[in-house]
Swiss-Prot record:
Involved in TGF-beta pathway. Plays a role in male tail tip morphogenesis. Residues 141-176 have a biased composition (Low complexity). Zn(2+) binds at C65, C110, C124, H129. Residues 197-393 form the MH2 domain. The gene is sma-3. GO terms for molecular function: DNA-binding transcription factor activity, RNA polymerase II-specific; I-SMAD binding; metal ion binding; RNA polymerase II cis-regulatory region sequence-specific DNA binding; transcription coactivator activity. Residues 136-190 are annotated as: Disordered. SUPFAM superfamilies: SMAD MH1 domain (SSF56366), SMAD/FHA domain (SSF49879). It comes from Caenorhabditis elegans. The keyword Cell membrane does not apply. This is Dwarfin sma-3.
Length: 393
């Protein structure tokens, strides 16, 4: 890198001194150069070039927002690639292996976070105003360089195979190789949504225990405690009884503790799971696996007190659009609307238990809203081998 520094001004050279990692040096230099130009000539927004130098020299979250104006499509072009600004500069100065905006979350004190960037003309690129969420276990710690956005027919396979060909996170993509505007699929025309956005069924091994819980609130906690009061924001598994419960199940239930929190972020078009317990939680979501370019059957481990995006609506709507007039594709897509969550014990190729029904305590989350969109599309599709959607079909 030293051989190239003489080509840049003193501000760029200084900022490059805090760069993390040795990969993609020329791209990082272009990214820093573009940022310096924007910070020098901006008249509005928050934060200066000096503020950026200060926070990089003295890393802390108690620092000013450093903003740049958003482009029409929300992305910043660096050389021949486009990317989300906050991801680009977190990649330069904090985490060179960042591959998706879903791996980042803004801190509470940030005034111009990416999550609310649709409501303002500016976005904060202070790398210390973002926290990194947990990466699903099995995702390489060193991600490859950004690749071209995949073509529509390779984003998802409707043949029922366990893997999908996906060059990058399809929607929204972190980077695209061409300089053009990247299309982000929006929610189709509205229709009458189901009264409950999802429902949860609790299982012990292969037996359902208790009623099916219908979720109306957008945020709900599922824990292992007993709560005699009826609450539509909390499901307490501790009060459910099962005469066939064995010692392994009893021991697992003791470790559920504070459990998980489900958040349907309607404004951000995704669903998050937060693990509030002191034990890991295991999740199988085909939508997440496709988004992370992993086998569709992959089981992700969420460490204690960590989060994972388990459903991305933009990706779903993109796949729904591609499944027009394809009943097999719609049947396959319905499987993406069922998410399995196991407490404490994992399953799959990395664990002794091969199937979720072999885990002591697990949940099935059925997403009613995307299933309703599929049902709406099915009514417009020739009915060949259409099946009632469920997690086992």
């Amino acid at each position: 890198m030293n051989g190239l520094l003489h080509m840049h001004g003193p501000a760029v050279k200084k900022l490059l001194g805090w760069k993390i990692g040795e990969d993609e040096e020329k791209w990082c230099e272009k990214a820093v150069e573009a940022l310096v130009k924007k910070l020098k000539k901006k008249n509005n927004g928050c934060g200066t070039l000096e503020d950026l130098e200060c926070v990089l020299a003295n890393p802390c979250t108690n620092s000013r927002c450093i903003t740049i104006a958003k482009s029409l499509d929300g992305r910043l072009q660096v050389s021949h690639k486009k990317g989300l600004p906050h991801v680009i500069y977190c990649r330069v100065w904090r985490w060179p292996d960042i591959s998706s905006p879903h791996e980042l979350r803004s801190i509470d004190t940030c005034s111009y976070p990416y999550e609310s960037s649709s409501k303002t003309m500016y976005i904060c690129i202070n790398p210390y105003h973002y926290q990194r969420l947990s990466r699903p276990q099995g995702l390489n710690s060193s991600m490859p360089s950004p690749q071209p956005i995949s073509s529509p027919n390779t984003i998802w396979q409707s043949s029922g195979s366990s893997t999908a060909s996906c060059a990058s996170s399809p929607s929204p993509s972190v980077f695209s190789e061409d300089g053009g505007e990247v299309q982000v699929h929006q929610r189709p025309p509205p229709f009458r949504h189901p009264k409950s956005w999802a429902q949860i069924t609790y299982f012990e091994l292969n037996s359902r225990v208790g009623e099916v819980f219908k979720l109306v609130n957008l945020s709900i906690t599922v824990d292992g405690y007993t709560n005699p009061s009826n609450s539509n924001t909390r499901i307490c598994l501790g009060q459910l009884t099962n005469v066939n419960r064995n010692g392994t199940i009893e021991n697992t239930r003791m470790h559920i503790g504070k459990g998980i929190q489900l958040d349907n972020k309607e404004d951000q078009m995704h669903i998050m799971i937060t693990n509030n317990s002191d034990m890991p939680v295991f999740v199988q979501s085909k939508n997440t696996n496709l988004m992370m370019n992993m086998p569709l059957v992959k089981v992700c481990r969420i460490p204690p007190h960590s989060q994972l995006c388990v459903f991305e609506f933009n990706l779903f709507f993109q796949m729904l659009e591609q499944s027009c007039n394809d009943s097999d594709g719609l049947n396959e897509l319905s499987k993406h609307c069922f998410i399995r969550i196991s407490f404490v014990k994992g399953w799959g190729e990395d664990y002794p238990r091969q199937d979720v029904t072999s885990t002591p305590c697990w949940l099935e989350l059925r997403l009613n809203v995307p299933l309703a969109y599929i049902d709406q599309k099915m009514k417009q599709t020739p009915r060949t081998n259409l099946m009632e959607p469920n997690s086992m079909t």
